[in-house]
C-alpha cells in the first residue's frame, strides 16, 4: 500500500515518469493518494458535469404532434482561474512534505499548470533501512498547460407524441483513441405548459419545463504503458446527472429569444482499477488491487439566455449559460 501515491502521480502525469523505475518510488499510501487525486481531479470532472448538460433546449414552444427534430449540438465550457489550482497543505497528508519544507503551496489541478515544477518528498518504510524518502514532481494539468475551455458535441433527436410534449435523446458513440474510450447518452422530456391553455395563441410567450438525464463514461487502459507491472490497469470514470429547467421563449415564426432557469445535480465516480505489482527491487513485494476510488457530488443553479433563427425546416440557435462553469452552445436542427 505504500506505493500507491507514487503510482497515482505517474498515471496523472501522463507518462512524465515513464523513464523512471516505479519500484524506486515507495510512496505514501492510499489515504494520501486519494486525498491528492480528489483535489487534483475534481475541478475537471465538475466541468464535465456542467458541460454535458448544455444544449437540451433551443426554444420554449413545443412541437406539433408527431413532429421530429434532429440536431447537432456543440458546446464549450469555460474554465475559471480558481479551478486551475488548489492549496495543498502538508498537514493534510501523513507521509508527504514539500522539498523546501513549505507548509503549503498552490499547486495545479488537472486544468492548471505548475510553472515551475513543484516537487514533494514521499516517506516510505524500507524493510532493511527503515524510513526513506524519494522526491517526486507533482503532475501538471492536461497537456502540460493551462486549460481554458473544454469542448463537447453530440447528436440529439426529439419526437412529439402529443402537441407540446417532446421526448428527447442525445448520443455520442463510444470511441477509442490511444487507449482512451469515451461515450455519452441521455434522455429528456420537455413539456410546454402554455399548450394546455384554452387560448394559447393569445399568450405572448411559451413556457415549458424540462427534465433530463445524462450519462458519460470513459476509461483509459494503460496496462501496456509499462508504468508498473500488473494486469487490466485502467482509470474508469462514470458521470450521471439530472437537470430540471424552467424555460420561456417568444413565439414568432422566424426569430425567437429564449431563457431558462435550471437546477443541476450530478455525481462522478473515478476508479483506479487493476492489479499493481510493486516491490523495492530486493526483498519486499506486494500486489495491490483496485487501490483508489474517488466520488464527487455536484449541485447548482444555472441561467441560460439564447436566440433561435428558423428558416423553413432548418433552424440554428446559440446560447450562453451562467453557472459554476460558464458555457456557450451552438445548435443546428432540422424539424419536420
Residue ranges, per PLM feature:
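N-terminal, post-signal peptide beta-strand-biased segments of exported outer-membrane/organellar beta-barrel
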Residues: 18-104
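Residues that define the transmembrane beta-barrel architecture of outer-membrane proteins
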Residues: 64-66, 148-153, 181-187, 203, ...
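Outer membrane beta-barrel transmembrane domains
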Residues: 258-336
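Transmembrane beta-strands of outer-membrane beta-barrel pores
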Residues: 74-78, 171-175, 193, 211-217, ...
